[in-house]
């Protein structure tokens, strides 16, 4: 998804907003994260509806097409309740999730199923990203391998 972001930024006719949603989801938290990347503060507003209206108004006033990337979505939610207006000429949404069910419930138009790496490939990638200089020995190697296993090829 970072690759998509960089590609869109190169085109220069998009405003790309990247928000990591994570497992501890709430509408208010997502609204705050979106507001933060937009450079506004919603903390003085308590009502979800008011916060959603403010976000919708900001999105509508943007001159460039907004591409909102919601990364690491764990559960479905109502886009309108958050304040995300989906309009082909104003705002488009890309979301990443491990759950096809989440995509279906949010009514994603297109779904791309990414293949995971097998354990050997994941370990090789981990070592490559670590760099050639540091060598993992003893406990560090076992901890690193447990991290690779926990990521499950993602």
Predicted feature residues:
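Non-catalytic, charged helical/coil tracts that couple and regulate nucleotide-powered enzyme cores
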Residues: 34-46, 89-91, 99-154
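Post-nucleotide-binding-loop coupling segment downstream of the phosphate-binding loop, primarily
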Residues: 1-54
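Conserved, well-structured core segments
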Residues: 17-20, 29, 67-68, 94-95, ...
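Mid-core helix/loop region of P-loop NTP-binding domains shared across ATPases and GTPases
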Residues: 26-33, 43-69, 74, 139, ...
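A conserved switch/coupling segment of P-loop NTPase cores
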Residues: 6-12, 52-117
